[in-house]
Amino acid sequence: MRKGIRPVFVALVLTASPAIAPFASAFRSPRTNPQRNEAKYQERLIKEVRHELRLLPYYTVFDNLAFKVEGDKVTLLGQVVRPTLKSDAEAAVKSIEGVASLVNDIEVLPVSPMDDQLRRAVYQAIYGDTALSRYGFQAMPSIHIIVKNGNVTLEGVVDSESDKNLANLRASAVPNAFSVKNNLTVASSAK
């Protein structure tokens, strides 16, 4: 009886394998799929990196974190007040699935009581203005104030060209600011 079942089983396997083959490729892991959609992969990676950086607990309005994604390589850029934020950002991005290599080019700003005082004064000048105060009510204010050796740089996104110019005007009016560099982008042109 067993001898009769074996040839039938072999015949079933041989006839069924061509019918199953097209479905087998659907069960392959996405990592082994050589035809992954690079654009979607890149978009997902950018979204994940941005999300992880925004979740950092000590990321403030006085820090600027940016990044660049090239394939599966991420480069962290920007300036931070606390050295721990640099290492926290690196650890958060390293933990993202799909990041093969990471370059951390985040600059830690020098400790200076004068710069701290200038940061607070520029913050008050910008976010104390009635036309710009709405940017301060967000979970992460969109105008970042970077101060290094008395030089102020504004980073982030605003809604209009007039808001960009007003923020620059308010920061320039603060005493003890040697220079103000306005790197703010307008939301409609940032897309």
Name the predicted role of every residue range.
Residues 2-10, 18-191:
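N-terminal targeting leaders
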